[in-house]
UniProtKB/Swiss-Prot annotation:
Catalyzes the stereoinversion of LL-2,6-diaminopimelate (L,L-DAP) to meso-diaminopimelate (meso-DAP), a precursor of L-lysine and an essential component of the bacterial peptidoglycan. It catalyses: (2S,6S)-2,6-diaminopimelate = meso-2,6-diaminopimelate. Belongs to the diaminopimelate epimerase family. This is Diaminopimelate epimerase. Keywords: Amino-acid biosynthesis, Cytoplasm, Isomerase, Lysine biosynthesis. GO terms for molecular function: diaminopimelate epimerase activity.
């Protein structure tokens, strides 16, 4: 099995071409490969598959380091765009992909920068999914004392955003796993901790479900900005600084698609003899 190791702002991936290769990896095998001591080491495994729709160029599957399959990864989408061009699976600069829950348009700009149309953020509780009505704010604030509950949103995957005064001292490793598996999130959730610097700049740390805290989370950056704009705290275009680097997020508001721009980096190619 041939693969590429890639990263987007330090959020690292093992990317596999399943268009020209026949590949199946069990959850146990994925966990083994994800191990940074005995395997390849990665936050997520990405499968690039043939499309299921004539209007789509590729189907995109994402597996977390714990072997669970998830429905969205913004940093991974940028790496996918770089990967399919690099491997000559397409010569397009605008690439249409599908996931289990959404469709995205990836536009390769220059110098390995990629702009991703992440679709329209969803705030309706059943679409997140979030199985509670009316009292979610009180319950979440009880779990995450000394934080301001920003909101919950789906960017193709669920996110809970907390607003903090100082992102460096945020208890990401404590609050993150508590909220990730909270009973009201039927599919678990990603948890973002956002510090607002001004209307055009935020600092963000993200605890990703099935992974833990990562250097960057593209969909998490999108979720944080969408929540911030909805609360009237942020402008339409915002620079999000994560531990691994910066993303630019643009959203005009309800009913509009949200856009993320950032880098995609190829590290090396490898081969695993099964």
């Amino acid at each position: 099995m041939q693969f590429s190791k890639m990263h987007g702002l330090g959020n690292d991936f093992m990317v596999v071409d399943v268009v020209t290769q026949n590949v199946y990896l069990s959850p146990t095998k994925i966990r083994f490969l994800a191990n940074r001591h005995s395997g390849v080491g990665f936050d997520q495994l990405l499968f690039v598959e043939p499309p299921y729709d004539p209007e789509i160029d590729f189907h995109y599957r994402i597996f977390n380091a714990d072997g669970s399959e998830v429905t969205q990864c913004g940093n991974g989408a940028r790496c996918l765009a770089h990967f399919v061009r690099m491997k000559k699976l397409t010569n397009k600069r605008e690439i249409y992909i599908s996931t289990q829950t959404s469709r995205m348009v990836l536009t390769i700009i220059e110098n390995n920068m990629v702009r991703v149309n992440m679709g329209v953020p969803k705030f309706e509780l059943p679409q997140i999914p979030f199985d509670m009505h009316q009292i979610e704010k009180k319950e979440i604030l009880y779990l995450a004392k000394n934080y301001i509950f920003g909101g919950i949103v789906s960017i193709g995957n669920p996110h809970c955003i907390m607003i903090v005064n100082n992102v460096d001292s945020a208890q990401v490793s404590i609050i993150g796993p508590i909220l990730e598996i909270h009973k009201y999130f039927s599919e678990r959730t990603n948890v973002g901790f956002m510090q607002v610097i001004n209307r055009e700049q935020v600092l963000l740390r993200v605890y990703e479900r099935g992974v833990g805290e990562t250097q960057a989370c593209g969909s998490g950056a999108c979720a944080a900005v969408a929540i911030g704009i909805r609360l009237g705290l942020l402008a339409e275009q915002v620079q999000v600084a994560l531990p691994g680097g910066k993303l630019v997020i643009y959203w005009r508001g309800p009913g509009q698609s949200l856009y993320m721009t950032g880098p995609a980096v190829h590290i090396y190619d490898g081969f695993i003899n099964d």
